[in-house]
Design a protein with these regions (language model features):
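Short, well-ordered, aromatic-rich surface patches in folded extracellular/luminal domains
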Residues: 1-14, 66-158
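Short N-terminal edge-element motif at the start of the domain
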Residues: 1-7, 11, 32-33, 38-50
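Short, flexible N-terminal segments of the mature chain
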Residues: 18-37
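Short beta-strand segments
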Residues: 20-22, 40-42, 91-96
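Short, low-complexity, polar/charged sequence segments that are solvent-exposed and flexible
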Residues: 25-30, 43, 102-105
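A short, structured loop/turn motif at beta-sheet edges
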Residues: 26, 44-51, 85-93
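Generic secondary-structure microfeatures
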Residues: 34, 56, 87-89
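Charged, amphipathic alpha-helical segments
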Residues: 47-73
């Protein structure tokens, strides 16, 4: 995670090509990109940066999570989601998931994380993935309320 970044989100296609990105620095500068172009920049108040850190602090489970533990949906193709989160106490986590937005799709099947014990085809409830999405959505709501276009904060192609 870059030194002065408190939140960073990158959505790529299955081949790793960037679709959108939002990055929030410690000083409150927000940079938004779509398809590798800088398309929006704005400034947050310190209170909003602190709010983002506070949101992460409220979801402490994600700070102890590893990308290999995140449950994956049974989707052949799709997207990759990259998250950097920083809590109020300075703890940081960097996570990568495949198609994590599918936690919102009713009836979608999920398998255990890549290195979790158990059968590879064992269907599970995506508890860790849901916690990451919930944290992300709370931060996204704060950013949208402060002028960031929601198109930079999508979890899937759509």
């Amino acid at each position: 995670m870059r030194e002065n970044i408190v939140f960073d989100y990158l959505l790529t296609n299955a081949w790793g090509l960037p679709l959108c990105r939002v990055s929030v620095s410690e000083d409150g500068f927000v940079q938004c990109q779509e398809n590798r172009e800088n398309t929006q920049g704005l400034q947050l108040e310190k209170a909003e940066v602190d709010k983002i850190k506070s949101i992460v602090s409220e979801h402490t489970h994600i700070l102890d999570c590893d990308s290999k533990e995140l449950e994956s949906p049974d989707v052949f193709d799709g997207v990759m989601n990259f998250f950097d989160f920083e809590a109020s106490d300075g703890r940081k986590v960097n996570l990568m998931a495949f198609n994590i937005g599918e936690v919102k799709t009713h009836g979608m099947s999920f398998s255990k994380g890549l290195l979790e014990e158990g059968e590879l085809d064992e269907i599970v409830v995506p508890v860790k993935a849901m916690e990451v999405v919930k944290t992300f959505e709370e931060i996204a709501a704060t950013l949208v309320a402060n002028g960031v276009d929601a198109k930079y904060l999508r979890l899937t192609y759509a």
